């Protein structure tokens, strides 16, 4: 199935039915009085988070979703039937914004989370409500209220604990397939990965975390070059980023340090908060480096890159070093999970406050110095 992570739809709630201005007319009841019923309420539009859905493709082509109107009231104090509600099922991780006002309507973070996005109109009142001691035969009634109508922007931000960064062919897909249950397409050409892949890494009974692989970044990605920029939003919810570097590129003219610096630069240009996330350096493809050159090449890379954070040396293909990295990730996430959840909640609250005022991850990673 094609991966779609953005869509625009229109949701239209049903109008309320009109009240009835009816009089009771029966044999032997000369002054029956008013008996007009109320109109039914209009149907509302809800969204529900569903963990079994992983793309917004259903909403790329079905752009209008309408609930039914309420029925009009009738005589004999018969109320109109309420309109049926419409329920839209969306992936967990979907962010819903009102395109006209910029209001953040919902952030679907839990399975079965239900949110009202367009409220149906109230039904009108029948003339029975207007009966009084001085008005025994009222002819007044009210019309139903119109339902809400909204243009919504849907954005899917996958929910993962760990995100993978790196140039195309850095070995990200090989790594995620080696340590998790994900089975991404793997080949020796750039941009084999065209959509985010999620994998569950199981460390032990009841111990696991989710890792996300996005298409590789290239220089200029923040301005739209390549594929990775359109998927960087999927890393915004992660608690840890792994920066994978190909330490043994096939093209000897390629400088891994220059590529790594380009990735960091693109990350910073795209989103400063994403740049500030905890980030570990993972030097991959050590199996392609002669054993007597490995230490020299690793030390040279770290010095030229100016990196002072955690460093892991692995071979995703052979599995060398992967187990230690996985356990280190799990321990880190277990230690910082509460802080990361608090940060996500604060980010969401800040976003809401900002939008209201305008009308329209994890603890900070301390580094003495960072790569430029």
From Swiss-Prot:
Domain OBG-type G, first and last residues per copy:
160-334
Which SUPFAM superfamilies does its entry note? Answer: Obg GTP-binding protein N-terminal domain (SSF82051), P-loop containing nucleoside triphosphate hydrolases (SSF52540)
Where GTP binds, per the record, is at 166-173, 191-195, 213-216, 284-287, 315-317
Q: Which domain of life is it from?
A: Bacteria
> Is Hydrolase among this UniProt entry's keywords?
yes
- What InterPro entries does the entry give? G_OBG, GTP-bd, GTP-bd_Obg/CgtA, GTP1-OBG_CS, GTP1_OBG_dom, GTP1_OBG_dom_sf, OBG_GTPase, P-loop_NTPase
Cofactor(s) listed: Mg(2+)
Write down any Gene Ontology CC term: cytoplasm
Its keywords, alphabetically, are: Cytoplasm, GTP-binding, Hydrolase, Magnesium, Metal-binding, Nucleotide-binding
Q: Does the keyword Nucleotide-binding apply?
A: yes
Disordered: annotated segments: 128-147
The Swiss-Prot or TrEMBL record annotates one GO molecular function as:
GTP binding
A single GO BP annotation from the record? ribosome biogenesis
Matching Gene3D superfamilies: GTP1/OBG domain (2.70.210.12), P-loop containing nucleotide triphosphate hydrolases (3.40.50.300)
Family assignment? Belongs to the TRAFAC class OBG-HflX-like GTPase superfamily. OBG GTPase family.
Q: What does this protein do?
A: An essential GTPase which binds GTP, GDP and possibly (p)ppGpp with moderate affinity, with high nucleotide exchange rates and a fairly low GTP hydrolysis rate. Plays a role in control of the cell cycle, stress response, ribosome biogenesis and in those bacteria that undergo differentiation, in morphogenesis control.
Record-linked HAMAP family: GTPase_Obg
Listed name of the protein: GTPase Obg
Q: Can you name the source organism? A: Burkholderia thailandensis (strain ATCC 700388 / DSM 13276 / CCUG 48851 / CIP 106301 / E264)
Question: What gene name is listed for this protein?
Answer: obg
């Amino acid at each position: 199935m094609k991966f779609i992570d953005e869509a625009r739809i229109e949701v239209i709630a049903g109008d309320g039915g009109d009240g009835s201005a009816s009089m009771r007319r029966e044999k032997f009841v000369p002054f029956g009085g008013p008996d007009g019923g109320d109109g039914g309420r209009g149907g509302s539009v809800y969204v529900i988070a569903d963990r079994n859905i992983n793309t917004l493709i259903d909403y790329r082509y079905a752009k209008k979703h309408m609930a039914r109107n309420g029925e009009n009231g009738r005589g004999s104090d018969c109320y109109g039937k309420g309109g049926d509600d419409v329920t839209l099922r969306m992936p967990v991780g979907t962010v819903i914004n009102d395109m006209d006002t910029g209001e953040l309507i919902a952030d679907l973070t839990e399975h079965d989370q239900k949110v009202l996005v367009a409220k149906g109109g109230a039904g009108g009142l029948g003339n029975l409500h207007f009966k009084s001691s001085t008005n025994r035969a009222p002819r007044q009634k009210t019309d139903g209220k119109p339902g809400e109508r909204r243009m919504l922007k849907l954005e899917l931000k996958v929910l993962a604990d760990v995100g993978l960064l790196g140039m195309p062919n850095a070995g990200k897909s090989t790594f995620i397939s080696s340590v998790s249950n994900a089975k991404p397409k793997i080949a020796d050409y750039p941009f084999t990965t065209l959509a985010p892949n999620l994998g569950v890494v199981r460390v032990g009974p009841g111990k696991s975390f989710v890792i996300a692989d996005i298409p590789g970044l290239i220089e200029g990605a923040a301005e739209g070059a390549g594929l990775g920029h359109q998927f960087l939003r999927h890393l915004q919810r992660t608690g840890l980023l792994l920066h994978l570097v190909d330490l043994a590129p096939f093209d000897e003219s390629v400088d891994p340090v220059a590529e790594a610096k380009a990735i960091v630069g693109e990350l910073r240009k795209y989103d400063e908060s994403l740049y500030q996330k905890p980030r570990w350096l993972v030097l991959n493809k050590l199996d392609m480096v002669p054993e007597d050159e490995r230490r020299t090449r690793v030390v040279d890379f770290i010095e030229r890159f100016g990196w002072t954070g955690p460093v892991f040396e692995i071979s995703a293909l052979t599995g060398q070093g992967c187990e230690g990295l996985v356990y280190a990730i799990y321990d880190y996430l277990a230690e910082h999970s509460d802080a990361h959840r608090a940060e996500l909640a604060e980010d969401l609250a800040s976003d809401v406050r900002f939008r209201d005022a305008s009308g329209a991850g994890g603890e900070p990673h301390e580094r003495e110095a960072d790569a430029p």
